[in-house]
Amino acid sequence: MIGKLKGTLEHIFEDYIVLDVHGVGYVVFISNRLRPSLPSVGEALSLFIETHVREEAIRLFGFATRAEQEWFCMLQNVPGVGAKVALAILGTLSPDELAQAIALNDVAMISRAPGVGKKVSERIVGELKSKTLPFEQAVKTVSVPQREITHQPAHDALSALMKLGFEREQAARALALAMNALEGEAVSSALLIRHSLKLLSSPT
């Protein structure tokens, strides 16, 4: 199995590149997020590699960071999510944004990925929420994405908390903890605000 490749970028195509390693050209599939950060053709490039062995072919998937590679593997543990869907998600969301979306039950954010519908997004949230970092640790270690939170009650609650003077990141973390505590209940923006304010007013 190939875990990492370091060589010279030889060609860039729509959804893959050719990486020359000591005269051997490797076809490596990449995400849309990685493409803009690629060096120019002829320059050095190092990628973490996930190898898929199938009866008909061997495919290599390349990632700039270990975190992206780990999320790629984790996503494929969800029923109905294959390599193509996992790569599409990572082409739309960074690992931090994906972790935040799962923490906030933000199905709409995950659904922004091409070919990813609401049912698949809900399955991803349901399957991976308990398999990622412990919740409190996760919301402390991921950065809050600058894009809009699309879960409507959370979005409304976030706007209200920011109007009360709380920083966006501080408010979003409190919201994430509130949503985790209220999981399984009918969540309204008012309920989220009340729980978030309790957390924000508690001594750290």
Swiss-Prot record:
Residues 65-143 are annotated as: Domain II. Gene3D superfamilies: 5' to 3' exonuclease, C-terminal subdomain, DNA helicase RuvA subunit, C-terminal domain, Nucleic acid-binding proteins. It is found in: Cytoplasm. Residues 144-154 are annotated as: Flexible linker. It comes from the Bacteria. Keywords: Cytoplasm, DNA damage, DNA recombination, DNA repair, DNA-binding. One of its GO terms (biological process) is DNA recombination. GO terms for cellular component: cytoplasm; Holliday junction helicase complex; Holliday junction resolvase complex. CDD domains: UBA_RuvA_C. Transmembrane segments: none annotated. Residues 154-204 are annotated as: Domain III. InterPro entries: DNA_helicase_Holl-junc_RuvA_I, NA-bd_OB-fold, RuvA, RuvA_2-like, RuvA_C, RuvA_C_sf. Residues 1-64 are annotated as: Domain I. One of its GO terms (molecular function) is ATP binding. NCBIfam families: ruvA (TIGR00084). The RuvA-RuvB-RuvC complex processes Holliday junction (HJ) DNA during genetic recombination and DNA repair, while the RuvA-RuvB complex plays an important role in the rescue of blocked DNA replication forks via replication fork reversal (RFR). RuvA specifically binds to HJ cruciform DNA, conferring on it an open structure. The RuvB hexamer acts as an ATP-dependent pump, pulling dsDNA into and through the RuvAB complex. HJ branch migration allows RuvC to scan DNA until it finds its consensus sequence, where it cleaves and resolves the cruciform DNA. Homotetramer. Forms an RuvA(8)-RuvB(12)-Holliday junction (HJ) complex. HJ DNA is sandwiched between 2 RuvA tetramers; dsDNA enters through RuvA and exits via RuvB. An RuvB hexamer assembles on each DNA strand where it exits the tetramer. Each RuvB hexamer is contacted by two RuvA subunits (via domain III) on 2 adjacent RuvB subunits; this complex drives branch migration. In the full resolvosome a probable DNA-RuvA(4)-RuvB(12)-RuvC(2) complex forms which resolves the HJ. Has three domains with a flexible linker between the domains II and III and assumes an 'L' shape. Domain III is highly mobile and contacts RuvB. Belongs to the RuvA family. This is Holliday junction branch migration complex subunit RuvA. It comes from Bartonella tribocorum (strain CIP 105476 / IBS 506). The gene is ruvA.
